[in-house]
Amino acid sequence: HGWAVRPTLRLALFSGVFSLTGSQETSMTDQPTIAIAQINPTVGDIAANVELIRAARAQAQDLGCDLVMTGELAVSGYPPEDLVLKKSFQDAVKKAVLGLAKLTSDGGPGLLISAPWVDDAHLYNAALLLDGGKIKAVVPKCVLPNYGVFDEKRLFTPGDQPGAVNFRGIKLGIMTCEDMWGADVAQTLMKDGAEVLLVLNGSPFELDKSHMRIDLARERAHETGLPLVYANQVGGQDELVFDGGSFVINESGDLKVQFPVFESRVEAVSFGWDNDILAPKPGLMVDALDENEAIYKALVLGLRDYVNKNYFPGVMIGLSGGVDSAITAAVAVDALGADRVHCVMMPSPYTSKESLEDAAEAAKLLGVKLDTIAIQPAMEAFEGLLREQFVQHPADTTEENIQARSRGLILMAMSNKFGYMVVSTGNKSEMSVGYATLYGDMCGGYNVLKDVYKTRVYQLCAWRNANHTDGLMGPTGMAVPER
């Protein structure tokens, strides 16, 4: 790259940034290039996460990039919750970060990563700049979210307002996720001479969230006159789904790069100088998904990662002949493939002929194994066990719920025997009004539709029957029977 070399030796703590350098520092060219590593880390699997970062850096090195940036807490996985309070975990994270720092001694791209970081007995959610074989700077997150699914104030110490960090001749304004949501941190970085804002994120998927992120980034760009690079993680972690959708805007708020959602991607972003302003060049631009496609792909990714990251061989679903279990099975096949989805139809004496036909048709369309286990013997056994206790009480919902609980018992027994995780099928409309049976149709380790209203269920069925896109492992064409 024809970089100039100048010796540096400094150890300083300024404005919430720990700067630790003691090696020769290279300068970026007039056309600096930053690679965004939109990767899918796993909470607690430090070795696998480090390998993802290594692979992203190798790819960026082939592209001639100067710096690689990841999402929030990419080393530990996000959100790590109480795992970060264990000293053994903190030590393992530190060892991993030092190993990644050593990787940068080859003169290739620097790394801007994120990890739980202990300093002076304080635990920070920190961005770390690695270059020349060293940790060049540690930038703690200032604004810790404490609402909804976030409880970072319980775990981390907030950092002070940060200063800009010099990287190969360019002053970086480094922020982590919530730091960007208000004006203060970006303004402080601008006043300290930052020439570009780099934001590392662990921002989960919600409808219209991508527009909110871009709008906030535009506000920061307009306020500071600086370009902004937004790197978000992708993947499922327990009940959360991270959609990625990383992007770059220029100092005027114009969108110059837009990553895809729900898929891992490493892409180089090139910059040039325009009247002393670092200007991102137009790059990858991916169109936004419509609502139903976005929701469907979020469901697929969430289930896929929950199953794979917890090492389940597959899933088991009670197929009733209804729309909820049919779309759940379709999502499961699109996430895992038909060979990892085992469906069970469990008819009672009251199950309609149409339900039996629809369950069989759903299994046929998806190519999944379907067992049929009649629950009448279980119902009669339970009713016989309880007959003496119920003798003076007329039949009511108790007997109806025995049907659901018999099915739950069968599914959980098969799960125990074969190791497949049971996926429950109730939707958000049912859950919100209590239309479900405890220890019956609520049995399961994961519920695909827990945040999907019934009206949306029908929309997702229509979308899936009309569409098949990259990343879906199920069949093309109709996936949910229509009646």
What are these regions, as identified by a protein language model?
Residues 53, 298, 302-370, 378-382, ...:
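Extended, hydrophobic alpha-helical segments in both membrane/secreted and soluble proteins
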Residues 199-200, 277-282, 337-342, 359, ...:
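Short acidic (Asp/Glu) and glycine-rich catalytic loops that position anionic groups and cofactors
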Residues 263-270, 340-345, 353-398, 404, ...:
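A conserved beta-strand->alpha-helix junction
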